[in-house]
């Protein structure tokens, strides 16, 4: 699948693009209701027939597949690529994704939450109240951070830690000045200190987070050994440890935003909007359609279901369920 951007957009927008996108696959398979107006009044309806034509011409015919098989193949490829990206930042860095929750965001993230949970092995998905504006919301909520880095490139035994502490003080002063210039009120200011380290002869470094009190030869050796063991499952004996870079970050903590103000109020509406036919894993399913923002706190929806709102659509696969928590998030889990 290739991105068509917002202009001209997917084939189903009927704005000149004739090649299939992930959105076209979701529309053709019924996961996005074609008769539903697109958020913000951009379009009053989507043309599923154009999605079908694009998939048929560019994927199904060249590969000798049916159009339904081709559409599912598009999503299989897209999900596999996204799962691969998750593995790069988790498994390949020594983290077990099963210890994390998966949070999709953006207009299309909720359509793939169950597939990604299956692909990566995550037990819980958390769909935020307004996924389509998660990045914008983050800009007004997030703490402010300034980073600095300086090269050391010395053997651990040669490092002058008094000089390192003096450098840290200089970086702290410079980063604090940048925080002050933002004109933002902070409730607290924290610092992060890390060193890029490796064994002599290696080309890759390992970032080791430390406290000021660990900045000694013994303290840093222990911190590096523990980090290396966690990342690679073993520690090399013999090679000299080198310290390549000093990293410093200063974080201004902003007042916390109470996400519960976004939660639904009152009894809400559990009545489905109707039934949508959805093609999933080789067969058709009758999926209930819900107005997601009308669901009350505590509501539990069983898949297959489609939860719609102006900024996103959530596809809840068969075998999954979603519960509205106290902050309006959807907690997605596999059915017991």
In which residue ranges do the predicted regions lie?
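C-terminal, non-catalytic interaction/recognition modules in large multi-subunit enzymes and RNPs
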Residues: 3-13, 18-97, 104-336
